[in-house]
Every structure is written in C-alpha cells, then in structure tokens.
Amino acid sequence: MSAEVPEAASAEEQKEMEDKVTSPEKAEEAKLKARYPHLGQKPGGSDFLRKRLQKGQKYFDSGDYNMAKAKMKNKQLPTATPDKTEVTGDHIPTPQDLPQRKPSLVASKLAG
C-alpha cells in the first residue's frame, strides 16, 4: 500500500504541473470567450444555412444550372429515327439553282 501512495502523489503533482503549464492557455481562452461569446457555439453555421444545404444540390451560377439541365435533357431525348429518306449533300447548287435575292428597302451607305 505504501507503494501506491507515492504513485498517487506523483500523479497529483504531474496534474498540478500540467495545470500550471496549461493555465496560461486556459486564461487566454477564457479572455477570448469573454470577448467573443458567439464563437464556438454552433459549428457549421446558422440554422438557415444548414437548412439550405440540406435541401440538395445548389449551383454556383446560371451556367452550372444550365449545364446540369442540358445533361438531364440529353438523357431523356429519344434517339433519331433512321427511316428518314432525306439525303443532304448529294447536289451541289449552282447560281442558276439559287433563288433571286430580294432588294433591300434601306439604301446602303456604301453604294454612293
């Protein structure tokens, strides 16, 4: 039993020494808590912020929103039907094939 008493005494002494070492830190911490009482109360922000974050994915700007919207549309679009008979590029137009250009109602400033 006598062997346990010095161990207990040494443990108490160590605790006192630790308290002395950490007491300046605790004193500084107490000063900061007195000066800024609202800090450290609610980690993670206000209730409003937490509620908004729980609602789901939010977008950085309208570009992100539109890109996500386009991705969703692309997944829902049906594939093009292959039964189209219209072929493009088989005929090269000539000036005679093109329709006549309509004259402009506003006179050009360049035509003198």
Swiss-Prot record:
It comes from the Eukaryota. Residues 12-32 have a biased composition (Basic and acidic residues). GO terms for cellular component: cytoplasm. Residues 1-49, 72-112 are annotated as: Disordered. Isoform ARPP-19 is found in all brain regions and also present in non-neuronal tissues. Isoform ARPP-16 is enriched in the caudate nucleus, found in low levels in cerebral cortex. The modification N6-acetyllysine is found at K109. Residues 1-11 have a biased composition (Low complexity). The modification Phosphoserine is found at S2, S23, S62, S104. GO terms for biological process: cell division; G2/M transition of mitotic cell cycle; mitotic cell cycle. Phosphorylation at Ser-62 by MASTL/GWL during mitosis is essential for interaction with PPP2R2D (PR55-delta) and subsequent inactivation of PP2A. Phosphorylated by PKA. Pfam families: Endosulfine. Its main location: cytoplasm. Protein phosphatase inhibitor that specifically inhibits protein phosphatase 2A (PP2A) during mitosis. Inhibition of PP2A is enhanced when ARPP19 is phosphorylated. When phosphorylated at Ser-62 during mitosis, specifically interacts with PPP2R2D (PR55-delta) and inhibits its activity, leading to inactivation of PP2A, an essential condition to keep cyclin-B1-CDK1 activity high during M phase. May indirectly enhance GAP-43 expression. Interacts (when phosphorylated at Ser-62) with PPP2R2D. Interacts with SNCA. Interacts with PPP2R2A; the interaction is direct and this interaction inhibits PP2A activity. This is cAMP-regulated phosphoprotein 19. It comes from Bos taurus (Bovine).
